[in-house]
């Protein structure tokens, strides 16, 4: 995020945004932050929403105040907001397609998920499970939540790995899984 926005500001594609907040995936805190940004008079708010519906009231208030709201990854369902989303389920499924090409005999798979309860985590995991259903030579032997953080993922994997049968592959939701197994 920092690299891309920094380059975009230097090229004049976007103006510099002096405010950056994090709510640690807490809906009430995120809603309060949106309301503070409204009061501060920002022209736009870009948000990775902690909940698809839980922020709609605050987002609607921002839109009503003439603020452009853009949600990405964790998107909001409020119609006034712009939504930038990818096919997260497809992202999960394509991992298993790749494994099927690389490991045609299949085997046990360890799934390292993201942050529990977040739409993106659920969608990617759903895609992984759909991929395993399509490629029946694979079986998910275990699943842990790595919270999209390498240290958390490594600790979670260390806790479950000794109890699993031989694992042939690891599927993840991002770089958090590197070096985890």
What are these regions (language model features)?
Residues 1-181:
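A residue-level marker of the well-folded mature domains of exported/periplasmic proteins
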């Amino acid at each position: 995020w920092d690299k891309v926005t920094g380059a975009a500001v230097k090229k004049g594609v976007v103006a510099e945004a002096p405010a950056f907040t994090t709510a640690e995936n807490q809906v009430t805190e995120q809603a309060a932050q949106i309301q503070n940004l409204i009061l501060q008079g920002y022209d736009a708010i870009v948000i990775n929403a902690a909940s698809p519906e839980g922020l709609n009231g605050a987002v609607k208030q921002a839109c009503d105040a003439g603020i452009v709201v853009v949600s990405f990854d964790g998107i909001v369902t409020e119609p006034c907001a712009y939504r930038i989303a990818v096919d997260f389920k497809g992202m999960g499924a394509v991992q298993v397609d790749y494994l099927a090409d690389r490991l045609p005999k299949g085997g046990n798979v360890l799934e390292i998920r993201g942050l529990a309860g977040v739409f993106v985590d659920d969608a990617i995991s759903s895609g992984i499970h759909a991929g395993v259903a399509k490629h029946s030579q694979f079986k998910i032997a275990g699943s842990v939540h790595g919270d999209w953080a390498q240290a958390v993922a490594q600790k979670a994997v260390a806790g479950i790995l000794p109890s699993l049968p031989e694992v042939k592959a690891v599927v993840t939701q991002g770089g958090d899984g590197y070096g985890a197994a």
